[in-house]
Amino acid sequence: MDTQPYYKTIIEQIDKHTAYRQECLNLIASENVCSPAVVNILSSDLANRYSVGRPRTRWFPGLQHYDQVEEIAEKLSQKLFHVEYANVQAPTGMVANMAAYLAVLKPNDLVLALRVKHGGHYSHVAENIFKSFNIRVEDLPFDEESYSVDVER
């Protein structure tokens, strides 16, 4: 299947929409307009990096430049808002996961989860926010040789 005509049409429609929006006065508060500088930053590779953790203590390698950007943004935020501490990290999968968990779980419920090193998500671990809600978390038994959940245990 040749997707090029579809791609071309999609790009044309995006360009037309962009031109149209530049001629409008948008009075919908939730539809904020980003400056070209912000659009440039958000379309950079940094926007697609999985940056779990804090600067210099990330769970994944290769984020040294990301760390510097985050540290600068936090210092600017501290100065702008006259505060001693600022966290500029966007809500991520953890926020979505916790919203889902808290919608269906009750105190003392049990969650079985994979550890991060076995492919689980960092929001599934016992050391996380679950403690605040008295939700128990246990590791799924994992066979490191076959790299699979050990259903026999």
Model-based region annotation:
Residues 105-121:
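Conserved PLP-anchoring active-site segment centered on the Schiff-base-forming lysine
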